[in-house]
Design a protein with these regions (language model features):
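Metal-dependent catalytic neighborhoods of phosphoester/phosphodiester hydrolases
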Residues: 123-133, 276-277
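Active-site metal-binding loops of divalent metal-dependent hydrolases
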Residues: 16-17, 74-77, 118, 148-149, ...
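Short beta-strand scaffold segments in enzyme catalytic cores
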Residues: 59-63, 205-210
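Active-site glycine- and acidic-residue-rich loops that bind
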Residues: 123-125, 194-206
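Cap/insert and terminal regions of metallo-dependent hydrolase folds
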Residues: 87-98, 213-288
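Metallo-beta-lactamase
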Residues: 1-105, 109-121, 128, 137-197, 215-221, ...
Length: 288
């Protein structure tokens, strides 16, 4: 994606990987054959490959303002044991760090890491392995997490310490080091960085509204994974906490930004991952 300029703010994509990680029927369990066939022509090959794999990007968005460098989500990370996800298991890649450098920053320049939610592909670079310990990757950053989301996963990890490795290696070390800033999902950092509560995919998910009216962008997190969920906003995906609520959230957000100049920066859309919301029948589409 080409950097987006919003007056004195720029947004850069920092891509870790992209590929067809899940079968479309597995990823969207309620997607009907009729719905898929009706939309196959525009979905393939950009969003779904010839074998039915949903093409997803795993990336962060870097926001550069006059005052702060802010990273939204932190991908999968290196050396993280993810045995149920072979494409993420024990990664050892310099692509993410090179992406930061290409955008003009290093890990030491990041002031905030904002975790839209605490799934493993959004928190991985929170930490890095150093002498057998998980330490903060971004040495001066505050890590911003929604309070109910953190409480939910902390309890899960307490109940089953081996069952949620991304919490063990990428979230709790940040909390234990007192680097976490725990907030409500309607948190406002300043006049140009504010959260939008977007629950459903997670119990306490947030998106990030960047910029000022008429010159703004919404960084979605996992409010949406594929543009087929624009066409069918009620279409849930396999990892939703509450698919019904997620569908209601999508409609509410798309209604808010439809036919406006707001740029949607969608974490999991294949590159370039951005578009503006426009009406499309009973749903919505994304246009450049």
């Amino acid at each position: 994606m080409t950097a987006i300029t919003l007056q004195d703010i720029t947004i850069h994509a920092v891509v870790e990987q992209q590929g067809p990680f899940f079968d479309v029927k597995e990823f969207f369990p309620t997607l009907t054959k009729e719905q898929f066939d009706e939309n196959r022509a525009w979905l393939q090959p950009t969003f779904i490959d010839a074998n039915g794999g949903v093409i997803l990007c795993v990336q962060s968005f870097l926001i550069k303002t006059p005052r702060h460098n802010i990273l939204i989500d932190s991908c999968v990370g290196n050396h993280k044991p993810r045995p149920t996800r072979p494409f993420w298991n024990m990664m050892d890649s310099d692509r993410f760090e090179k992406g930061l450098v290409a955008a003009g920053v290093t890990v030491g320049d990041i002031d905030y890491v904002m975790c839209t939610h605490l799934h493993g592909d959004h928190v991985g670079w929170n930490t890095r392995l150093e002498n057998g310990r998980w330490v903060a990757t971004f040495p001066k950053a505050k890590y911003v997490m929604a309070d109910r989301e953190l409480a939910y996963w902390t309890q899960k990890e307490n109940d089953d310490p081996s069952g949620f490795p991304w919490i063990t290696d990428s979230v709790l070390p940040i909390v234990d080091a007192k680097r976490a800033q725990i907030v409500k999902s309607d948190f406002v950092l300043n006049e140009s960085i504010q959260f939008i509560p977007t629950p459903g995919h997670r119990i306490d998910h947030y998106s990030v509204l960047v910029g000022r009216p008429g010159h703004d962008a919404s960084i979605t997190g996992d409010m949406i994974h594929s543009p087929i969920q624009g066409k069918y906003p009620e279409l849930g995906m396999r990892a939703d906490y509450d698919s019904r609520q997620a569908g209601q959230t999508r409609r509410k957000v798309f209604d808010r930004f439809c036919d406006t100049s707001t740029v949607m920066c969608v974490v999991h859309f294949p590159s370039p991952s951005t578009g503006r919301v426009r009406p499309w029948g009973d749903g919505y589409k994304f246009v450049a």
